[in-house]
């Protein structure tokens, strides 16, 4: 009996210890997933979960702050220019040439994106169709006399048909987005281009507003003050939206959406 109790106690302690000690490979996988280049619009669909009946009625899944897919980048190794403090006023490792720049070039460096998106679209079309048909036949004559039926009707007819169609349509759409967001370099490509990704969350009263951005930039397009225009980003994915009560009031309910589709 004592041996059985000791065995159970040992098993329990071992299980608790297993829960406390985390597998290093699991930590590595979490870091890898955190540094994945995720689309700013689509998000990380691999980890989407059902948020309950409220989100089902809303018809959308709101993103959350602190998503591991958008976590900051933390380089494991120290940068090449890093050096321990020696107490000297001059350190060659911290020296910067007069003609050198401080543009982001490595993993984890930051750059500020100036949002200046303006798009306009206008389209119109006019169509006009018309068709006219006329057909007639003179009365039949036999021996110089009209051939009649019953003394009242002759064999003649006259037909006319007119068809007219006029249609016009027009569509106008414009979008504007201005502001700024600071993002991080998550990968350096072989040609020197930089993959960037970042998000900004603002808590305002009863809801949150967020901006997410990802894309590819060239170091040459970065300005001297470490900023770059959003129009210089290749494969840009920009998402600006919100969550909470104010966002819910801007969208129709699920019954309204159902009848809009059904009817």
Curated annotation (Swiss-Prot):
GO molecular function: cytoskeletal motor activity
Disordered as annotated region, ranges: 123-143
UniProt key word Phosphoprotein: no
Listed GO CC annotations: bacterial-type flagellum basal body, distal rod, L ring; cell outer membrane
Residues making up the signal peptide according to the UniProt record: 1-15
Bilayer topology term: Lipid-anchor
Pfam family, one: FlgH
Top-level taxon in the UniProt lineage: Bacteria
Keywords noted in UniProt: Bacterial flagellum, Cell outer membrane, Lipoprotein, Membrane, Palmitate, Signal
Subcellular location: Cell outer membrane; Bacterial flagellum basal body
Main subcellular localisation: membrane
GO terms, biological process: bacterial-type flagellum-dependent cell motility
Lipid attachment locations (N-palmitoyl cysteine): 16
Record flagged with keyword Acyltransferase: no
Lipid moiety-binding region (S-diacylglycerol cysteine): 16
InterPro entries per the UniProt record, alphabetical: Flag_Lring
Protein's job: Assembles around the rod to form the L-ring and probably protects the motor/basal body from shearing forces during rotation.
Subunit annotation: The basal body constitutes a major portion of the flagellar organelle and consists of four rings (L,P,S, and M) mounted on a central rod.
HAMAP family with a match to the protein in the record: FlgH
Family: Belongs to the FlgH family.
PANTHER family reported for this sequence: FLAGELLAR L-RING PROTEIN
Protein name, UniProt field: Flagellar L-ring protein
Native species: Aliivibrio fischeri (strain ATCC 700601 / ES114)
Name of the coding gene: flgH
């Amino acid at each position: 009996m004592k041996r059985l109790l000791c065995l159970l106690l040992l098993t329990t302690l071992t299980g608790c210890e297993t829960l406390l000690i985390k597998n290093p490979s699991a930590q590595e996988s979490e870091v890898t997933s955190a540094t994945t280049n995720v689309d700013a619009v689509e998000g990380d669909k691999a980890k989407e979960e059902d948020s309950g009946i409220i989100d089902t009625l809303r018809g959308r899944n709101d993103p959350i702050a602190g998503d591991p897919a958008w976590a900051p980048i933390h380089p494991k190794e120290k940068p090449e220019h890093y050096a321990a403090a020696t107490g000297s006023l001059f350190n060659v490792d911290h020296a910067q040439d007069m003609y050198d720049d401080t543009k982001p070039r490595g993993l984890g460096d930051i750059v500020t994106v100036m949002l200046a998106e303006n798009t306009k679209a206008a389209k119109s079309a006019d169509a006009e169709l018309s068709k006219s048909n006329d057909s007639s036949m003179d009365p039949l004559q036999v021996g110089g006399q009209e051939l009649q039926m019953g003394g009242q009707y002759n064999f003649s007819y006259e037909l006319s048909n007119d068809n007219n169609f006029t249609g016009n349509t027009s569509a106008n759409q414009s979008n504007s987005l201005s502001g700024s967001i600071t993002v991080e370099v998550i990968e350096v490509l072989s040609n020197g281009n930089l993959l960037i990704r970042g998000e900004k969350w603002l808590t305002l009263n009863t809801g949150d507003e967020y901006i997410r951005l990802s894309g590819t930039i060239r170091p040459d397009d970065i300005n001297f003050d470490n900023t770059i225009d959003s129009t210089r980003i290749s494969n840009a994915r920009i998402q600006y939206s919100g969550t909470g009560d104010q966002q819910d009031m801007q969208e129709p309910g699920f019954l309204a959406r159902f009848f809009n589709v059904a009817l």
